[in-house]
Structure formats: structure tokens, C-alpha cells
From Swiss-Prot:
Reported function: Probably functions as a manganese efflux pump.
Family: Belongs to the MntP (TC 9.B.29) family.
UniProt xrefs under InterPro entries: Mntp/YtaF, Put_MntP
Transmembrane segments: 3-23, 41-61, 69-89, 105-125, 133-153, 168-188
Domain of life: Bacteria
Organism: Pseudomonas savastanoi pv. phaseolicola (strain 1448A / Race 6)
Membrane topology annotation: Multi-pass membrane protein
Protein name: Putative manganese efflux pump MntP
Entry keywords, A to Z: Cell inner membrane, Cell membrane, Ion transport, Manganese, Membrane, Transmembrane, Transmembrane helix, Transport
PANTHER family xrefs: MANGANESE EFFLUX PUMP MNTP-RELATED
Gene Ontology molecular function terms on file: manganese ion transmembrane transporter activity
GO cellular component assignments: plasma membrane
Amino acid sequence: MNPISLLFLALAMSTDAFAAALGKGASLHKPRFIEALRTGLIFGAIETITPVIGWGIGQVAARFAESWDHWIAFTLLLVLGLHMIYNGIKHDDDEEQEKPGQHSFWILAVTAFATSIDALAVGVGLAFVDVNIVIAALAIGLATTVMVTIGVMLGRVLGTMVGKRAEIVGGIVLIIVGATILYEHLSAA
């Protein structure tokens, strides 16, 4: 795989994570760069690992991954999105929210995994292409880290505009990302 193709692959793999990061940034109370970077690193690490796992699985699991990846991603993002909407409604007057400016590691990791399931499937395909999987995975992870960090900071602007309802907006964004993943896979079938 040539470097230009690898760059486009890395950017394409980071788009779902970028969209989810916009939602995460919108739901945070004035996120600092360090929080955006932390989120980017979590997403980037998971997005680096998933194509390697997919590459290792190979052709046998390709049919399973292709037939279920969109449903798994949609379900995870739907549940996370609904949870964020619920918290946004429930916590309007309740101060028992997570610390302002921070999401838990597990919420970020599950969201990152949900948006990286397509990278798992891509990894399966990369097993049959002349590509150095380590370089490809690192490129995908780096692109995701950068895109997610930017997405969280851009989401901050969105969060400032919508005020208290930012977590609801973030949840809606996650649901839209999940629905888009599902739609793209079903319409291609």
C-alpha cells in the first residue's frame, strides 16, 4: 500500500471517532486541551489496536465481522447516546454529575471501541494486502488521536452554544454516528 493510500485510509478510519469526539466535547464543561488530548490518546490507542486484531483474525472471521460490525457499533453508540441524553435531562438540576471537564475512562474506551469496529474489519482486509500492519496501525492511531483531540476542542464551541443541554446534544451526535454506520453498511448490502 502506497503512503498516499495509507494516509487516506488513516483519515477515513478516524472520521467516526472525530464525530463522536464532537459530541464528547459538547458534553464537557469547558474542556481543556489536556482533556482533549487524553480523549484523543484513548481513542487513538484503541484505533491502533483494532486493525492489528482484525489483521490477526484474517479471512475466516471476515464474513462475521462484516455482517455484524455495524450492528455492534450502532448498539454501543445508541446505548451510550441514550445514556448521555438521560444524564443531560436528569442532571439539569442535579449536581452529582461527573467532574466538569472530564469523562470516565470507561465511557471513553467503550465509545472509542464502538467507533473503531470498522477498523477491526479493515484490519481483516489488510491481511490480504501488501502492507506493513504496524505502520498502518500507527498511522490510523495517530490520525485518530489528532482528529479526536481537535473534535473535542471543536465540540467545546458547540457545548458553549447549547449550554446546559450539551450532554443531550452529545448523546444525539453519538446516536447519529451509530445510525450513519448502520445505514452505510445496510445500504451497501
